[in-house]
A protein has these predicted regions:
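Short, intrinsically disordered terminal tails adjacent to the first/last structured region
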Residues: 1-5
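TM-adjacent membrane-interface loops and short helices in multi-pass inner/ER membrane proteins
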Residues: 276-302
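Hydrophobic transmembrane helix bundles of membrane-integrated enzymes that assemble
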Residues: 7-31, 47-262, 283
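Conserved phosphate-coordination/catalytic loops
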Residues: 272
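Juxtamembrane/transmembrane-helix boundary motifs at the membrane-water interface
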Residues: 30-49, 299-301
Length: 302
């Protein structure tokens, strides 16, 4: 029995290494694609990694079922459903990033999340740093946009909002890795960086998210110093569905949007006209179960 367990552990160990290698290749592809860096990532290499990841996921699901590494029988079923739904969406809207993300998500089963986070952080910080240096020294273009609030800088990324989103995700992953070791100085620095990024990009929504993140980190840190562990309160587990609540809330806000309502006007202004824009898109194109292709001003979006 011990020999069987040791074999299983070894298999899982090498499978996790394979996953991390594939994760590095595909993450670099998408991250570089979001920058203005003039580096051509070989498309053939990306396709090879993609097909290798597909094979890995199939083997991974088979091992999960064979070794019974699931808390409920619905878990492997749910893994397959994720892949099927992502595959249908990709087929309809031709956005292969959806299926790639599903592959990475399902493939992460039995891979320590901290290893994935460390790898992502290393890739993100290096590419982000190189892109920023190249943009600020004139090696590559710093794409700028004129807005009512001023000039928005992209700092080496394709779009100002994307630049702010990249920095936000870097801070989120960093905070998750630090956990209880995160200090007040680090939280303050994240707030300062967020404010600086906002000053350059004028990406309001990302700035709001960053400030909420810093505020929540401060609250958790203070409560921890008072020996109050939030994980002990079962009622707080409801927080795990906040993302679903947010999605439903956004759909309802768009569905019942009233341009003449003062509250809606204020809310729409806070979110940079995202609600009114979505309302127009809903009125013109509707919502389909697996997405649709939208053509606007000669641009095709999934």
């Amino acid at each position: 029995m011990e020999n069987n367990h040791s074999v299983v552990d070894q298999v899982n160990k090498y499978m996790s290494y394979i996953y991390l290698i594939l994760f590095v290749g595909i993450t670099m592809w998408y991250y570089l694609y979001s920058t203005v860096l003039e580096y051509k990532y070989p498309y053939a290499l990306y396709l090879g990694l993609r097909y290798a990841l597909m094979a890995y996921v199939l083997v991974s699901i088979a091992l999960v079922v064979w070794q019974k590494q699931y808390s409920t029988v619905l878990e492997p079923v749910f893994m397959v459903l994720i892949l099927v739904s992502a595959g249908v969406v990709t087929y309809v809207v031709k956005d292969y990033g959806v299926f790639d993300f599903a592959l990475l998500l399902v493939g992460a089963k039995n891979v320590p999340w901290k290893r994935i986070a460390y790898v992502y952080l290393c890739i993100a910080v290096v590419i982000q740093g190189v892109a920023y240096y190249a943009a600020t020294t004139g090696i590559i273009a710093d794409i700028t946009l004129q807005a009512d609030r001023g000039i928005r800088h992209s700092l080496g990324i394709n779009y100002p909002t994307d630049m702010a989103a990249h920095v936000l995700f870097i801070m989120l992953v960093y905070a998750a890795l630090r956990e209880k070791k995160l200090t007040f100085v680090e939280i303050t620095m994240m707030g300062v960086v967020s404010y600086w990024v906002y000053g350059k990009t004028l990406a309001r929504n990302d700035f709001i998210c960053a400030m909420v993140m810093c505020l929540l980190l401060l609250v958790v840190k203070v409560l921890g110093l008072c020996n109050i562990q939030l994980s002990k309160y079962k009622a707080l587990k409801a927080g795990s569905i906040l993302m679903l609540v947010a999605v439903v809330g956004c759909v309802m806000a768009v569905t019942f949007y009233d341009p003449a309502n003062a509250v809606y006007q204020k809310l729409d202004a806070v979110f940079s006209n995202r609600i009114s824009l979505s309302y127009q898109g809903l009125a013109q194109y509707g919502i389909t179960a697996f997405g649709s292709v939208v053509e606007e001003n000669q641009a095709v979006l999934g």
